A protein has these predicted regions:
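Short glycine-/small-residue-rich Rossmann-like dinucleotide-binding loops
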Residues: 4-5, 73, 175
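Contiguous beta-strand/loop segments that form the cofactor/metal-binding neighborhood of enzyme cores
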Residues: 116-204, 233-250, 270-271, 288-299
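C-terminal capping/lid region of NAD(P)-dependent oxidoreductase domains
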Residues: 48, 75-79, 273-299
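Beta-loop-alpha module in the N-terminal Rossmann-like domain of NAD(P)-dependent dehydrogenases
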Residues: 1-42
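Glycine- and charged-residue-rich phosphate/anionic-cofactor binding loop of Rossmann-like
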Residues: 220-224, 242-264, 283
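A short helix->loop->beta-strand "cap" motif at the edges of active sites that frequently abuts
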Residues: 19-21, 46-48, 169-170
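Hydrophobic residues in well-ordered beta-strands that form the structural core
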Residues: 25, 31, 50-52, 173, ...
Length: 299
């Protein structure tokens, strides 16, 4: 279980795999796609499993949202939006400088929750287009023990992306550490016959709501399963269950898989590359849409 800072993930994960260990990593899998790709290939060549956070898409809230989509309640999804906006971690984190270095920023730090949620709902991403800015080149720290120190910002702090999914939905994703206050939703899916309101993908619960075109009010969706609060470790439990089952280890059979994490990493790097080049980027990876969580996984 790798809980090191993002810049160390590739090195630590590689060392564990080379020592013959299965690996479950904090997100992101690595800070660039080639390092992530090498980790997935290394795991496959050693007949080992590699998994990666986040696993919040396995929680009761996003499992309920998935069930709504799979049931066709809002019709075919046409578009979606997701927003992770705030004012940055320097007001609460004791040592927040790494949040403003390559491999972090709002996209790499919190973006994996949102991108993993979207891939869980829609499947793999085909291409991205984006713009990005560094809101302030230096940011003061407001938390102890480094209060008053300045952080040199070297990665974008406001990123706006358009995601083109293989399955079709045109999706907007905004991640930002430059928003003092906002009333934007965490996420919404717009179907042919209704809208699905998504929960915070950095949590395991709700609320999940739906409103059809002929309905005057939003109605709550019952959550799916028992994992509503503080259920971090579901992805690791799912991977452990796969290992115990004796299933072939050459495929990403567990849900929070290395293939999923690599695809999310590819999407994030492609977003930043698109913003820098001011042009569309086609992703070079893909993954399976994770299967819904079965009730026995974390038993």
């Amino acid at each position: 279980l790798d809980l090191t800072v993002p810049a160390a993930h590739a090195q630590v994960n590689r060392a564990a795999l080379e020592a013959g260990k299965h690996v479950y990593s904090e997100k992101p899998l690595a800070t660039d796609r080639e390092a992530g790709r090498e980790l997935v290939k290394l795991a496959e060549s050693h007949h080992l499993l590699i998994g990666c956070a986040p696993d919040t898409f396995l929680g009761a809230g996003l499992q309920a949202a998935r069930a709504v989509l799979d049931a066709g309640t809002i019709g075919t999804p046409v578009a979606a939006s997701a927003f992770m906006v705030g004012f940055g971690p320097e007001r609460w984190h004791p040592d927040p400088a790494f949040f403003y270095a390559p491999g972090a920023g709002p996209l790499f730090d919190v973006g994996p929750y949102y991108l993993t949620m979207l891939v869980h709902l829609f499947g793999p991403i085909a291409a991205v287009n984006a713009s990005a800015v560094i809101g302030r080149r230096q940011r003061p720290i407001f938390s102890e023990p480094l209060k008053g120190s300045l952080i040199d910002v070297t990665t974008p702090t406001h990123v706006s992306a358009h995601l083109e999914f293989v399955s079709g939905p045109a999706t907007t994703l905004v991640t930002s550490f430059d928003v003092p206050a906002s009333e934007l939703p965490r996420g919404e899916v717009y179907g042919e016959s209704g809208t699905l309101s998504l929960p915070d993908p950095n949590t395991f619960g709700g609320p999940v709501k739906v409103r059809l075109v002929d309905e005057p009010e939003w109605r709550p969706v019952p959550l799916a399963g028992d994992y509503e609060v503080e259920s971090r470790g579901l992805g690791l439990a799912d991977m452990a269950a796969t290992i115990r089952s004796g299933a072939p280890r050459t495929a990403a059979r567990h849900r929070a898989s290395g293939a999923l994490a690599l695809h999310v990493l590819d999407a994030m790097q492609s977003i930043l590359e698109s913003a820098e080049a001011r042009q569309w980027r086609t992703l070079t990876t893909s993954c399976e849409r994770p299967a819904p969580l079965s009730t026995e996984v974390a038993a």
